[in-house]
Curated annotation (Swiss-Prot):
Family: Belongs to the DnaA family.
Gene from which the chain derives: dnaA
Name of this chain's protein: Chromosomal replication initiator protein DnaA
Keyword Endoplasmic reticulum: no
GO MF term set: ATP binding; ATP hydrolysis activity; DNA replication origin binding; lipid binding
Chain intervals for the UniProt region annotation (Domain IV, binds dsDNA): 342-461
Localization terms from the record: Cytoplasm
Length: 461
């Protein structure tokens, strides 16, 4: 009784949560009755703690409504349901079964097949330097790292495919390699293939030229895990999309892991067939956002430590407050500072950094101003620039204004009173409220989260 109600509870959670929240936290759960206790199994401690903190009250309330005093006790545990019976898992009716165009062998993850010679060097494409241990985690990438870690521990499981999207230089490629390293560590003979999407296209073209398309198909459909970076470069390449469509179906039928990255949300990728974009969303889709200030500082401190440099805290904060677009830009700036310090023998101070990064800092300050933010946000939401400064409080105007205030705090060095002055002489408390409101909405609303990320990318590019 309780186990069947658990499936109904899952259905309610699916209705109440966003697709990403459901896929991330609820779908991996399994449940089994032990006496008068319903044991809910989570794949790892991170998922367990999150579900218990965020969703325990909803689960308890559901069982109390359905069973009253007979509601079972709940217990959380890490692992898989031990029973040999079919698992009661939150995966039903989530993903359609792919229809393969023809019969395809379905090797299990534990039994990789012999590797054709077509691309035998792909195994070396997993970079051993990219690990989870040296990936700096923050709010901007926390979900992405958690999902990637889960995939590395349980490839071909609940998060398949895993789709990571976000701007350039935010750590998507790092996570792909970290997953590959995790899989190979747990199973050294696993066939894990990482590549840029253009390499897939090149391999297919070469196979066509050499009359080796069947070997190409056999290779890609036999791998244990396929990671493709920048899938948006498949745009308008019809033959490549056709071949990848069938490869995708074959791998998913065999429970082999697929991870894809892009600079855009799947449905926003132009030039890619709808049937592919639909499949990209079958598993879990996670945004990797530009790092917030604390994460940027942590990245700089980690990079300096790896380089054997003692970076003063105030210098790290100075750089992090001024360079905000992506991790690659941060690391490049720090490398320049370190190189200048080594060449000149001078200590790394704020004044030294101002001098070493003079052109970069000047360009950044020129590009991102409150006026530029206001114009960009007004254009994005299709409102008049005058509305940004007006007293109008309708949501269609107030929300973009709050967004612009939050972005001004994030992307400029202006104080709250200075930002308020730029928005029609508003008080600094109004700006603070706007920043907190947008931060809250980014947690609750997928649309607001997307808008914020899109605007950050536009303003930082």
């Amino acid at each position: 009784m309780a186990v069947s109600l658990w499936q109904q509870c899952i259905a309610r959670l699916q209705d109440e949560l966003s697709a990403q929240q459901f896929s991330m936290w609820i779908r991996p759960l399994q449940a089994e009755m032990e006496g008068d206790t319903l044991v809910i199994y989570a794949p790892n401690r991170f998922v367990l703690d999150w579900v218990r903190d965020k969703y325990l009250n909803i689960i308890n309330q559901f069982f109390t409504e359905q069973m009253g005093a007979d509601a079972p006790k709940l217990r959380f545990d890490i692992g898989s349901r031990p029973s040999a019976k079919p698992v009661v898992q939150a995966t039903a009716a989530i993903r359609p079964k792919p229809a393969a165009s023809k019969a395809v062998e379905k090797p299990t993850f534990n039994a990789p097949q012999a590797e054709p010679a077509i691309t035998a060097n792909h195994r070396s494409n997993i970079n051993p330097t990219y690990q989870f241990d040296n990936f700096v985690e923050g709010k901007s990438n926390q979900l992405g790292k958690a999902a990637a870690l889960q995939v590395s521990e349980n490839p071909g499981g609940a998060y398949n495919p895993l789709f990571l999207y976000g701007g350039t230089g935010l750590g998507k490629t790092h996570l792909l390699h970290a997953v590959g390293n995790g899989i190979i560590k747990n199973k050294p003979d696993a066939k894990v293939v990482y590549m840029h999407s253009e390499r897939f296209v090149q391999d297919m073209v070469k196979a066509l030229q050499n009359n080796a398309i069947e070997e190409f198909k056999r290779y890609y459909r036999s791998v244990d895990a396929l990671f493709i970076d920048d899938i948006q470069f498949f745009a308008n390449k019809d033959r490549s999309q056709e071949e990848f469509f069938h490869t995708f179906n074959a791998l998913l039928e065999g429970n082999h892991q697929i991870i894809l990255t892009s600079d855009k949300y799947p449905k926003e990728i132009d030039g890619v067939e709808d049937r592919l974009k639909s499949r990209f969303g079958w598993g879990l889709t996670v945004a990797i956002e530009p790092p917030e200030l604390e994460t940027r500082v942590a990245i700089l401190m980690r990079k300096a430590q790896e380089s054997g440099i003692n970076l003063p805290d105030e210098v790290a904060f100075f750089i992090a407050k001024r360079l905000r677009s992506n991790v690659r830009e941060l690391e490049g700036a720090l490398n320049r500072v370190i190189a200048n310090a080594n060449f000149t023998g001078r200590p790394i101070t704020i004044d030294f950094v101002r001098e070493a990064l003079r052109d970069l800092l000047a360009l950044q300050e020129k590009l991102v101003t409150i006026d530029n933010i206001q114009k960009t946000v007004a254009e994005y939401y299709k409102i008049k620039m005058a509305d940004m400064l007006s007293k109008r409080r309708s949501r269609s105007v107030a929300r973009p204004r709050q967004m612009a205030m939050a972005l001004s705090k994030e992307l400029t060095n202006q104080s709250l009173p200075e930002i308020g002055d730029a928005f029609g002489g508003r008080d600094h408390t109004t700006v603070l409220h706007a920043c907190r409101k947008i931060a809250q909405l980014r947690e609750e609303s997928h649309d607001i989260k997307e808008d914020y990320a899109n605007l950050i990318r536009t303003l930082s590019s």
